[in-house]
Amino acid sequence: MSASTMTPGEIVSELDKYIIGQNRAKRAVAVALRNRWRRQQVADPLRHEIHPKNILMIGPTGVGKTEIARRLAKLANAPFIKIEATKFTEVGYVGRDVDTIIRDLTEFSIKQTRELEMRRVRSHAEDAAEDRILDVLVPPARNAMGEPQRDDGNTTRQTFRKRLREGSLDDLEIEIDIAQATPQLDVMTPPGMEEMAEQLRGMFAGLARDKTKPKKIKVKEAFKLIIEEEAAKRVNEDDLRAAAIANVEQNGIVFLDEIDKIAARQESGGADVSRQGVQRDLLPLVEGTTVNTRYGMVRTDHILFIASGAFHLSRPSDLIPELQGRFPIRVELDSLSADDFVRILSETDASLVKQYTALLATEDVQLAFTEDGIKRLAELAFSVNERTENIGARRLYTVMEKLLEELSFDAGASSGQSVTIDAAYVDAQLSEAASSQDLARYVL
């Protein structure tokens, strides 16, 4: 089921599989996604006036802000890009300007649309690839124009077609004309001029288009290459670009991470010279403007922006007022408790417990985590967070890696063993590091 047709409740249920708690953030994101679908159902004059309500997520590091965006990207069948606000500088300074956000989003949409189109024409491309390989194996008669006159009733051709489909010819080497690969050209340009580099690459790529050369290759590999080639022939580039740009304009989502890092603090000095400039450059993008990309003009009026930040050293009110007004929905994410850590380790679909169990199972080492073992692991991770820097759920990675360090190193020699990870095992491996503040700071 596509996220565009899912109800907010279904979207939240899907996010619950990977993210514990943070219901307010999940609900806000789910409603924003559903509003996309609702807007499409509204009649045209009013539909154009309905703009997405951008979201600002506020919360400490490691509580799920980025994970919500990452899972949303997989869930939403829409152009999506996650970028760090700190990568951009004010126009005129060395660095990337904010328009590259929309250019990158358009590139993603072109790639996504091309993949969909290639899948749509794949069956026709497979038939054409089959015929081209059979033309080499059983050369047909040719007309005055040199075009093959295929006789599908030919018994020999049908025999080879059957063998080709069965895979018995996969290792046979044939010589066939294959389109030349586009030369990879690396263009060095000053920061902020990436668009010029893309145009130069496109220009040189066009020079090698439609050129073929004979190549000796196995039937199996030839079949894959020719399918790609034939599918590309059947995709109309102009229609593809128009569809991709429309998809960006109507369904695009930009996740703007670390926005707190470009909020100028009142007491800060000259080091923040370009921070307010970046905020001012973001204003028209978030409000609605037209950005020139190499595929055409892209309007940003209906692109959804989701910003997030920890706001440890600054506050949302430190953002310039105009930008604050462009993010009307504000959601605070909660710090994680020890109980949340237990749920993260045991309830999520791709929990660390499942990941490490699967990894060591490849070496025939069977891990079994008990409830008290998981609880003790969560308590230690929470305790280290309380006494040192609070990095949220990311602390579980460090603690789990330290816990299984010896086991992972000796896994090859321990093949066939079963190891139970209970509270006693966790204490034996981690209690010393967790109890010493210095060790906890540098080891965990």
Swiss-Prot record:
Annotated keywords: ATP-binding, Chaperone, Cytoplasm, Nucleotide-binding
Keyword Nucleotide-binding: yes
Protein's UniProt keywords contain Ligase: no
Annotated CDD domains: RecA-like_HslU
One of the record's GO cellular component terms: HslUV protease complex
Source species, domain of life: Bacteria
UniProt: ATP binding residues: I20, G62, V63, G64, K65, T66, E67, D257, E322, R394
InterPro entries: AAA+_ATPase, ATP-dep_Clp_protease_ClpX, ATPase_AAA_core, Clp_ATPase_C, HslU, P-loop_NTPase
Gene Ontology biological process: protein unfolding; proteolysis involved in protein catabolic process
Compartmental location: Cytoplasm
GO terms assigned for molecular function: ATP binding; ATP hydrolysis activity; peptidase activity; proteasome-activating activity
Annotated Pfam families: AAA (PF00004), AAA_2 (PF07724)
Subunit structure: A double ring-shaped homohexamer of HslV is capped on each side by a ring-shaped HslU homohexamer. The assembly of the HslU/HslV complex is dependent on binding of ATP.
Family membership: Belongs to the ClpX chaperone family. HslU subfamily.
Role: ATPase subunit of a proteasome-like degradation complex; this subunit has chaperone activity. The binding of ATP and its subsequent hydrolysis by HslU are essential for unfolding of protein substrates subsequently hydrolyzed by HslV. HslU recognizes the N-terminal part of its protein substrates and unfolds these before they are guided to HslV for hydrolysis.
Stated name of the protein: ATP-dependent protease ATPase subunit HslU
Species of origin: Bordetella avium (strain 197N)
The encoding gene: hslU
